[in-house]
Amino acid sequence: MLALVDANNMYVSCERVFSPRLRGRPVVVLSSNDGACIARSNEAKALGVKMAQPWFQVRHLEKTQGLIAVSANFELYGDMSSRMMAIEARYAPRQEVYSIDESFLDFEGVRGDLVVLCRDMRAAIWREVGLPTCVGLGPTKTLAKFANHVAKESERKPGAYPRRLAQICNVGAVGQAELEELFAATEVGNIWGVGRRITTKLNESGIRTVLDLVRSDAATLRKQFSVVLEKTLLELRGVSCMALDDEPAGRQQILVSRSFGKAVTSVDGIVEAVSEFAARAAEKLRQQGSMAGAVNVFFTTSPFRKDDRQHEANVTIPLVRPTADTRHLVGAAAGAVHRLYRPGFNYAKAGVMLMDLQDAGAQQAELDLFGDVEPSSPDAPSPGRAKLMAAMDTLNRRFGRDSVRVASQTAVSNGAETRSWSVKQERRTPRYTTRWEEMPKVRC
């Protein structure tokens, strides 16, 4: 039996852990540069706020309906997610982390009442992290996702499904007749993997509910759509077509990019931003145990600013040897900026992509800056470089991100750090769990 554990309105719930005043009130989390609503509380959904809706379209609800908006705090959300996933892992022998707020658990070999076990797990997550969750249980991944949908909607919309299925729904424990009733009450577009385009085509073919899909001919679906939809159908019938991936394959490319909070015109500003993005990408590279053989750097003006002169810079730099060293990757990215930068332009976005990724275990060509390497051979291999990067990562985890960093990541003006390119986050809450200086203070 598989379970899909999902935090309810993850980003909003994280904010509510440290700001109880937000509970029961309409809340939205805004995207980078505070442009669009990327998360909504149930109360905000009830006001009609749509996912990805531009903030300016609903800003009037602040005054008329008491809507509260906060800027995205991804550092906080990521840390809270890690804590939640660690708790879930205690309850099952295998876990696949699917996204920042979802994971699959495999209960094969686990004895006892799984609903009771999941109830204990939900209580532990709430007690230790403060996040509300829903759990869906089923014999396949797709059925577990469907069960999670039922568990959520039963709680959020009373009457949508039987109340007893709220919070924790085990479709493996309901009879066939009741399962078909649940299928009949669910639009086909709510099924995992069935997107808008496929939903439209299915509706045109007379398939509007999940029950309609389950009763369809598998071979016909494969012919008219794809083998993927056929597998979805089989999974809904209880035939497992997707195995649990408890050791997901590493990404083949790692991209970090941002739109700037305001236009950047100086080469130093672009170098600073690109250095930051390269450092973030290097962290992700080491986390998955890889090295990069090439670095792609780009920065561009905004095509939406018609009165501005337009310029787009893009280059890929092959590296002498694959590396996961932040210094080497930042150096390559910064060098590319100096070669491509042109004065007189209002740059609006930049990014760094690490390419040609390889297993670090198969590539140990690393340079130790503090080792016995001749200055004339900067690319000479040394195992010390990997140890230095591991120490850097450890210090940053312990004392907060960027406690140890490459100098070009942050510009300095009159002794003070400045980031002209930083995204607009006028409403960001403190990073309570990862920054000592932002930790909540209790006064006795």
What positions do the PLM features span?
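Short loop/turn motifs enriched for small/polar and acidic residues
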Residues: 138-140, 300, 353-357, 409
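Short, charged/polar, Gly/Pro-enriched secondary-structure boundary elements
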Residues: 111-114, 154, 306, 359-364
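Gly/Gly-Pro- and Ser/Thr-rich, intrinsically disordered tail segments characteristic of DNA damage-repair
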Residues: 1-234, 243-244, 376-444
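Broad gene-expression machinery/nucleic-acid interaction feature
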Residues: 2, 102, 132-134, 294-296, ...
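Short, charged/polar surface micro-motifs in flexible loops or helix N-caps
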Residues: 9-10, 34-36, 302-305, 357-361
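Short, hydrophobic beta-strand segments
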Residues: 103-108, 313-320, 365-373
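DNA-contacting surface of Y-family translesion DNA polymerases
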Residues: 190, 198-347, 361, 440-444
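C-terminal hydrophobic structural anchor segments
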Residues: 334-398, 405
